[in-house]
Amino acid sequence: MNTEQVREEVRSWLAAHWDPNLDLIEWRELLTDSGWGAPDWPSDYFGRDLAPQLSSVVDEELARIGAIGAAHSGVRMLAAVTLLAHGNHEQKQNYLRPILTGEHAWCQLFSEPGSGSDLAGATTRADLDGDEWIINGQKVWNTSAHHADYGLLLARSDWDEPKHKGLSYFILDMHQPGVEVRQLKQMNGHASFNEVFFTDARVPRANILGAPGDGWQIAMTTLAYERRSFDRPRNPAGKSPSSAPIYQQYQQELEVANEPYKWYPQRAGRVDLVLQRAKETGAINDPVIRQDIARLHILAQSARWTAQRARAAQKAGKPQGPEGSLGKLAASHIGRLASRVHTDISANEALLTGPDSAMEGVIAEVLVSTPAGSIAGGTDEIQRNIIAERVLGLPKEPRFDTGPFRDVPRNSSPKDQ
């Protein structure tokens, strides 16, 4: 199908089915079952086999009449992409539809207190007991785990294999005994993350993705998508009678989905506020400050163009290259530079919070939020290693952990052995 054929068909379907008086889940069930909720997915799994670049036409038509799309935001899509790539038929049938309708929320259960950057060093245990896997251990930095119905769990199922080969990937029910979720308070005042404890939690044998030991390769699929730019949840455009119940339900969903990310603009350094703040304080008259602002805006615009090229390549169906690592490195560098420029402009006032502080405390929040950019989602050092080894072809770092994982030196707990 070409662009105009897609536009005509989806427009005709929406004219016959869109009704703002429907319940949100009821509407999304119609949309999902029609294939228009995820048109670039396989037709066997709630899609229409459209080329990725044609899915934007569907988005445009939904927005034109104010129709709400499928639930595409956040970790839901990490789960969907991973299931599409590695799930069996039964898993896809059971879990993909409730992702698109918004009935199920998901979280990612990868990082651990003792293995953040070294993800393959995970020590959360998965022991097979009949038709169930018994899970014991701890995860951390889990966005939205306190709202999640299911988790994407990476756990160690074989201690006699090297660390990358002894991992398995599970779908874990978060609403069961043995799963405890605790929110973490950050130094910027937000609580975007959680720590999750497992005490004899259970996963049915049918809920392993791939085979035992395939966890590392499957996790790479999840992480490759995570490092790309997510499509943000779209507010209905055009004809949007906010009094209709469906829009109120959608707004409530957005508030829950976006709550962990409210501080993300500050994490990125708030480049958009630098010039305004320089004018307010008179620092714009300082030639050094002006030069720093110019450099900052040049870097930020270059990063935006790089991200646009990466998104265009993704929509054209090209494989993921080094753009994810390059973009993440650029973002953390820009955030640090913006934080320094804000400090130079506002001086001691940059440290103050409250209504009388610089931009009502936003600048202070920038200073305590930007360090996260160089850590979350893979540290700057990891991104540099990826670029060095996979793009530049430089020698890999020497490794001393290629034997059985139980023999690898580490800070172990009594349950590790």
Protein language model features and the residues they cover:
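Glycine-rich phosphate/cofactor-binding loops in nucleotide/flavin-utilizing enzymes
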Residues: 53, 57-58, 78, 216-221, ...
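A structural signal for short hydrophobic beta-strand segments in well-ordered beta-sheet cores
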Residues: 124-127
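Glycine-rich beta->alpha junctions and the first turn(s) of the following alpha-helix
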Residues: 179-300, 373, 411-417
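A short, Trp-centered hydrophobic/proline-enriched beta-strand micro-motif
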Residues: 102-110, 154
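A short core secondary-structure module
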Residues: 131, 136-182, 194, 218
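Internal helix-loop-helix
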Residues: 33-102, 144-150, 300, 307, ...
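Amphipathic, small/basic residue-rich leader segments at the start of a protein or domain
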Residues: 1-74, 93-98, 261, 280, ...
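C-terminal helix-coil-helix/basic helical segment that borders enzyme active sites and/or dimer interfaces
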Residues: 279, 283-290, 301-357
